[in-house]
Amino acid sequence: MPPRPKEYGAVIFAGICFGTTGTAQALGPKGASPLVVGAARLLIGALFLCGVHRLLHTGGQRLKAADLLSGGVGVALYQLSFFSAVRSTGVAVGTLTAIGSAPALTGTIAFLITKEVPSRRWFAATMITTVGIIFLTGAKGFSHVNVLGVLEALGAGASYSLFAVASKRAMSGGASFTETMYKIFGFGAILLLPCFALGKSHFLFTGSGFLMALWLGLVPTAVAYTAYGYGLNKIKVATASTLVLAEPATATLLAAVVLGERLNAYSWLGVSIVVAGLIYLSRE
């Protein structure tokens, strides 16, 4: 069955949920360890995803060990590199670089591993949205960009791509989208358990720290990846990686509305171009 508008809409909705991540971290306790933040997000998210799987009772084949391993490693590394990038170079630049690099990286990895060939519309839409992200990034300026933070964000993009390709391969092999998500995130959470001992986790026992961890585990993880998995089950992984570029547009708007960052004409133009690219791709 070919993908329907609701599959595209589900992935775009997931991208909107992803876009709340950086703002939630910025509103959390200052100096919170990115190791612990990432580990807490995965642990809470995995528990919620397990509940979703049990609630929906979706069947399917068991995940292959290779998909579980590569997906879990990818999602674990993403948490560490993304939250470190946001702390190093800020919400906007960290988010834009991480998710902005993902479509090209995902398309390349998917072709090398699964021989999945992206469509012409994907190439065009990815170029359109990339132009939008360039405007968004340029609008923030580069005077305060941390080179290490940018490298961490690129690492997050590569880690996300590894997770996405592994998840798609698992579902193509017969695993249900709910089982794929909860098992990969569960394995990733296990990998990050040592972070609670290595990093300072006392902030989790404060009001703002607890709410931040709960939000990160519930909205941009459990809710987002349930929607993402539902859409990815029918959509090419490269297409999905471009549709989630709703994330940087959302992050930019939230940075203005919630964090008080001022948007100039370049910001609005960038958001508009990204939205146009997403609409174009969703009509595939």
Question: Residues of each region from the PLM?
Answer:
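Specific transmembrane alpha-helical segments of multi-pass solute transporters/efflux pumps
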Residues: 21-22, 56-94, 98, 107, ...
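Hydrophobic/aromatic residues within transmembrane alpha-helices
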Residues: 28, 37, 41, 85, ...
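Glycine-/small-residue-enriched transmembrane alpha-helix faces in small-molecule transporters
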Residues: 1-39, 73, 77-81, 142-169
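Helix-helix packing/entry segments at the starts of transmembrane helices
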Residues: 40, 94-101, 167-189, 221-257
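Hydrophobic alpha-helical transmembrane segments of multi-pass integral membrane proteins
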Residues: 5-10, 36-51, 124-131, 148-155, ...
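Specific alpha-helical transmembrane segments that line the substrate/conduction pathway
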Residues: 36-47, 83-116, 156, 237-256
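Hydrophobic transmembrane alpha-helices of multi-pass small-molecule transport proteins
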Residues: 49, 75, 118-138, 157, ...
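C-terminal-most transmembrane helix of multi-pass membrane proteins
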Residues: 2-4, 40-43, 50-51, 209-211, ...
